[in-house]
Swiss-Prot record:
Keywords: Amino-acid biosynthesis, ATP-binding, Cytoplasm, Kinase, Nucleotide-binding, Proline biosynthesis, Transferase. Substrate binds at S50, D137, N149. It comes from Enterobacter sp. (strain 638). One of its GO terms (molecular function) is ATP binding. PANTHER family: GLUTAMATE 5-KINASE, ISOPENTENYL PHOSPHATE KINASE. This is Glutamate 5-kinase. It comes from the Bacteria.
Length: 367
């Protein structure tokens, strides 16, 4: 084995269930065995697990997935305890302790909570404990959900300071077309930079029991790679897949980390789920993309959502394209009032000001 590395392993519902309505315990046992081998060799392992709702369905005997949020949260509440018990039981066979972390979008949006989550996660790793992370589906509504465990795993990789992120799924990796519909589809083994062509290839296929498709895996890979983390999409059913990834053996699709990763604060900005959105005019778009300028109120055309000063927001051009994320210096109500006005008018309009810019260039990430 090479020197000690930190690996985040994301296990989708389709991997944990094998496409059935029940957890595939035999397969989970094998995945734990692989992780335990790496742990014994000195590597640091983080598990991002799906499957809480599936575990709840199995335990309570629900034949179908309910449609209401309340019923899904009920299943998640029951299933989450079953799931962590399973991880704890299996890792204990190898004398390994696990620690549960349940996160929501709010933990990622707020810088202080983000840093607290980071400190907790790294404390677990420093004490040779395997963190088991999931979104807190029992309490998370649409407004506070990260959205899927692919993106959650990318955020976990940033929190952990990971070297690699492994997204295990029911597919071998990213193909040139959907291999389930096109027998001519070819596996893409290496990716250097994610563009619109790749996003179009990924589409939005979703497994029957999960919430993430190949499109969300590309989003996760984009976030992780820009933070300097190699990302691999591979089949969870492949024998020895986790160990092979750590050995550097070609498995699935490898998204190469950027040579110059984002600094720590900008990793948070890039990874945090946006709390809202603003649309800017052509002049502001050009200033941001071509000249690296801050965003002035004059260039703002509209504001969507309700957010506070200091939260991360999405900046879009007139066509709706996501061009940047940044930390806003004004809340949503204030931005609506000063949108389209010169910076010199801020104090007269609001009765106060936090400076002439809406989003400073130092607090902005170009998408």
């Amino acid at each position: 084995m090479s020197d000690s590395q930190t690996l985040v392993v994301k296990l989708g519902t389709s991997v944990l269930t094998g496409g059935s309505r029940r957890l595939n315990r035999a397969h989970i046992v094998e995945l734990v065995r692989q992780c335990a081998q790496l742990h014994a060799a000195g590597h640091r392992i983080v598990i991002v697990t799906s499957g809480a709702i599936a575990a709840g369905r199995e335990h309570l005997g629900y034949p179908e997935l309910p449609a209401t949020i309340a019923s899904k949260q009920l299943l998640a509440a029951v299933g989450q305890s079953r799931l962590i018990q399973l991880w704890e039981q299996l890792f204990s066979i190898y004398g390994i302790h696990v620690g549960q972390m349940l996160l929501t979008r709010a933990d990622m949006e707020d810088r202080e909570r983000f840093l607290n989550a980071r400190d907790t996660l790294r404390a677990l790793l420093d004490n040779n404990i395997v963190p088991v992370i999931n979104e807190n589906d029992a309490v998370a509504t649409a407004e506070i959900k990260v959205g899927d465990n692919d993106n959650l795993s990318a955020l976990a990789a940033i929190l952990a300071g990971a070297d690699k992120l492994l997204l295990l799924t029911d597919q071998q990796g990213l193909f040139t077309a959907d291999p389930r519909n096109n027998p001519q589809a070819e596996l893409i083994k290496d990716v250097h930079g994610i563009d619109d062509a790749l996003r179009a290839i990924a589409g939005d296929s979703v497994s029957g029991l999960g919430t993430g498709g190949m499109g969300t895996k590309l989003q996760a890979a984009d976030v992780a790679c820009r933070a300097g983390i190699d990302t691999i999409i591979a089949a969870g059913s492949r024998p020895g897949v986790i160990g092979d990834v750590m050995e550097g053996i070609s498995v699935g699709t490898l998204f190469h980390a950027e040579a110059t990763p984002l600094e720590n604060r900008k990793r948070w900005i890039f990874g945090a789920p946006p709390a809202g959105e603003i649309t800017v005019d052509e002049g502001a778009t050009a200033a941001i993309l071509e000249r690296g300028s801050s965003l002035l109120p004059k260039g703002i055309k509209s504001v969507t959502g309700n957010f506070s000063r200091g939260e991360v927001i999405r900046i879009c051009n007139l066509e709706g394209r996501d061009i940047a994320h940044g930390v806003t210096r004004y809340n949503s109500d204030a931005l609506r009032r000063i949108a389209g006005h010169h910076s010199q008018q801020i104090d007269a309009i609001l009765g106060y000001e936090y400076g002439p810019v809406a989003v400073h260039r130092d607090d902005m990430i170009i998408r």
